[in-house]
């Protein structure tokens, strides 16, 4: 009986760590031929997962774009030059950008729970500068 309990508990805890799909995204001045970029433009996670943004180079942050998050999500804007994280509890698409570099195309999407129900809202955002083209490419890839 004791062995069975140990096996059950071990299986449970091992499966929990396998199911965890937290993601890490670097905030960078350059990646390949691109300038002012996040290392991943789109990440897909489950409800309850956390995304960690790492300030690998100075001058960057993460800001949820107004109108670009599911209903019920509060404003989120990290300080410049700081690593930050956000635990995603509400399913949907989250559009974000680097506040100082949004016009240079430093944007990304997080898709939570494979829920794309707010895609029409994401399409209505007034993206700036180079972000317009990148957002269109990201939206078309969803």
Predicted regions and their residues:
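Positively charged n-region of N-terminal signal peptides that target proteins for export
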Residues: 1-4
């Amino acid at each position: 009986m004791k062995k069975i309990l140990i096996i059950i508990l071990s299986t449970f805890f091992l499966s929990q760590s396998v199911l965890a799909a937290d993601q890490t995204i670097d905030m960078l001045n350059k990646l390949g031929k691109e300038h002012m970029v996040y290392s991943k433009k789109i990440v897909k996670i489950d409800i309850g997962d956390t995304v960690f943004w790492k300030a690998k180079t100075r001058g960057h942050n993460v800001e949820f774009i107004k109108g670009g998050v599911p209903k019920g999500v509060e404003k989120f804007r990290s300080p410049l030059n700081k690593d930050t994280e956000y635990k995603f509890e509400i399913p949907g698409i989250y559009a974000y950008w680097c506040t100082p570099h949004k016009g240079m195309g430093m944007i990304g999407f997080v898709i939570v729970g494979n829920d794309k129900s707010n895609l029409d809202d994401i399409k209505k955002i007034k993206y700036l500068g180079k972000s317009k083209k990148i957002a269109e490419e990201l939206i078309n890839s969803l």
